[in-house]
Curated annotation (Swiss-Prot):
The gene is pyk. Belongs to the pyruvate kinase family. In the C-terminal section; belongs to the PEP-utilizing enzyme family. It holds the Pfam family PK. This is Pyruvate kinase. Mg(2+) binds at residues 221, 245. It comes from Staphylococcus epidermidis (strain ATCC 35984 / DSM 28319 / BCRC 17069 / CCUG 31568 / BM 3577 / RP62A).
């Protein structure tokens, strides 16, 4: 199973049902909606299509809303384009004007208060660089030297590297977009241009007011955000390393080390991290990635990222499906080369000690030492699965949760395969349900060794405190099956009706010699029936058929060989009984 998750930006090139199906089958785990572009109506249509296709394919796909953020842009230029020439001067005005080679304006009127003489102003992702020469606050104008020649079009981005900018945490548009996302039940918010913890708290306040359970991933895109990363992470659920604007705001040569540091900090806290921007940029135009791009994706995985993201490659590129397949193949190859024993050792040293982490690290070490097939995490909130994931075990992590929201939010967590299954109230029922669900995924089968981890008592969030090593059971008896289907339950041996009186039979398989009239009312309440009585026309077989209860008859010594409270799998189609949960699907 591929462990690194893939986030795909959905746009004109990928919004059709046909292409979304291809992306999901190719490996997309999370769909990103970029609210810098498009109306609510357009995004609503995309959300509906994504959910329709995901449901048809029975795939868990998370939805990520990426805010436009409090960015600075230029206003419009005369004829849509001007040329700024190196060596000349240009005025940046705080008052809106039609841009010319001599003067243009920006959307942020307080820029004049934030910059100083000598500050740099970068235009259009740094393609044109200006240096502040004079500041005239009376006129609201900043005179700059043009350091290199370049074109400037309408509404291009403006960056102020090294300048503390007093922009609001979120704009009115962001707030409207977030409320739209709440209404549409999105799973993640990627908050653009986060500089300080208060920016995240502004979003969290809206979520709390609306009682929305949406995880927040601040996008670190500037030096101020990097400087405040510890405090930002304290109030965040994850992080996006957005290298596009970051590479403009800080020197490009600093980006790789900043990326490693940000990912490491997230790994230490067990918070998911997405590495984004220009990962396979050339695949917008070409069907094959460059060698440098392949190395970039692989190195992000070696750094410890949970997810890698495609932007223009899937939103507007010519080869969206090929881009996802390429990213998937790079991830699988990179993961195969990992030294998971060393990785676990490094993570054990990195992560702080706590009760929950103690269970997590024990699970990971046990999984490695016993070479278990899978780790099955029964989880309400996703906390158990994230706790295991932070130690990067080689074994598959199967997160069994009753919450569709939790499942989608686990879709971005490294190594976690989320499955939605109705919750169980007792510990035994929870464990049985977890094993049964793991088998249903096809990743666990008869005879496999697995680890089950959960929090008990059940139903309480954030209480991971239990680990169980479990061997998926073997065949213990054989007879003649009646009906079809299979059930898993605890055996209850009955010589007569009195043995069943007053018992809860809702998860029980009745084991008896034969069925008479006194037993029928109890058989109706059970989930399965095993009898020593032989024959397809026997009373036991007839009752099983009439009541639609999976039944196996003609099992010799059933009442002696099968013990009370033993967990058994009854497979009516094959006439077999297994101890524990067996793969009979």
């Amino acid at each position: 199973m591929r462990k690194t998750k893939i986030v795909c930006t959905i746009g004109p090139a990928s919004e059709s049902e046909e292409m979304l199906e291809k992306l999901m089958n190719a490996g997309m785990n999370v769909a990103r909606l970029n609210f810098s572009h498009g109306s609510h109506e357009e995004h609503k249509a995309r959300i509906d299509t994504i959910r329709k296709v995901a449901k048809r394919l029975n795939k868990t796909i998370g939805l990520l809303l990426d805010t436009k953020g409090p960015e600075i842009r230029t206003h419009n230029m005369k004829d849509g384009l001007i040329v700024l020439e190196k060596g000349k001067e240009v005025i940046v005005s705080m008052n809106e004007v039609e841009g010319t080679p001599e003067k243009f304006s920006v959307t942020y009127e307080n820029l004049i208060n934030d910059v100083n003489i000598g500050s740099y102003i970068l235009l259009d992702d740094g393609l044109v660089e200006l240096q502040v020469k004079e500041i005239n606050k009376d006129k609201g104008e900043v005179k700059c030297d043009i350091l290199n020649t370049g074109e400037l079009k309408n509404k291009k981005g403006v960056n102020l590297p090294g300048v503390k900018v007093n922009l609001p945490g979120i704009t009115d548009k962001d707030a409207d977009d977030i409320r739209f996302g709440i209404k549409e039940n999105v799973d993640f918010i990627a908050a653009s241009f986060v500089r300080r913890p208060s920016d995240v708290l502004d979003i969290r306040q809206i979520l709390e007011e609306e009682k929305a359970e949406i995880t927040i991933f601040p996008k670190i895109e500037n030096q101020e955000g990097i400087d405040n990363i510890e405090e930002i992470l304290e109030v965040s659920d994850g992080l996006m390393v957005a290298r596009g604007d970051m590479g403009v705001e800080i020197p490009p040569e600093s980006v790789p080390m900043v990326q490693k540091d940000l990912i490491r900090k997230c790994n230490k806290l067990g918070k998911p991290v997405i590495t984004a921007t220009q990962m396979l940029d050339s695949m917008q135009r070409n069907p094959r990635a460059t060698r440098a791009e392949a190395s970039d994706v692989a190195n992000a995985i070696y750094d410890g990222t949970d997810a890698v993201m495609l932007s223009g490659e899937t939103a507007a590129g010519q080869y969206p499906e090929e881009a996802v397949k390429t990213m998937r193949n790079i991830a699988v190859s990179a993961e195969a080369a990992q030294d998971y024993k060393k990785l676990l050792s490094d993570r054990t040293k990195l992560v702080e000690t706590s009760l929950v982490n103690a269970i997590g690290v024990s699970v990971a070490h046990t999984a490695l030492n016993l070479n278990v097939k899978a780790i099955v995490a029964a989880t309400e909130s996703g906390s158990t699965a994230r706790t295991i994931s932070k130690y990067r075990p080689h074994s598959d992590i199967i997160a069994v949760t009753p919450s569709e929201k939790t499942a989608r939010q686990c879709a971005i967590v490294w190594g976690v395969n989320p499955v939605v299954k109705e919750g169980r109230k007792t510990t035994d029922a929870l464990l049985n349900n977890a094993v049964a669900t793991a088998v249903e995924t096809g990743r666990v089968s008869n005879g496999d060794l697995i680890i089950i981890t959960a929090g008990v008592p059940t139903g309480e969030k954030g209480t991971t405190n239990m680990m169980k090593i479990h061997l998926v059971g073997d065949e213990i008896a054989k007879g003649q099956g009646v009906g079809r289907g299979s059930v898993v339950g605890h055996a209850i041996v009955a010589d007569s009706a009195s043995d069943l009186e007053g018992k809860d039979l809702s998860d029980k398989v009745i084991i008896t010699n034969s069925v008479d009239e006194t037993l029928v009312p109890y058989v109706e309440k059970a989930i399965g029936l095993i009898t020593e009585e032989n024959g397809i026309t026997s009373p036991s077989a007839i009752i099983g058929l009439e009541k639609g209860i999976p039944t196996v008859v003609g099992v010799e010594q059933a009442t002696k060989e099968i013990k009370n409270d033993m967990l058994v799998t009854l497979d009516a189609s094959q006439g077999k009984v297994f101890e524990g949960y067996a793969n009979v699907l």
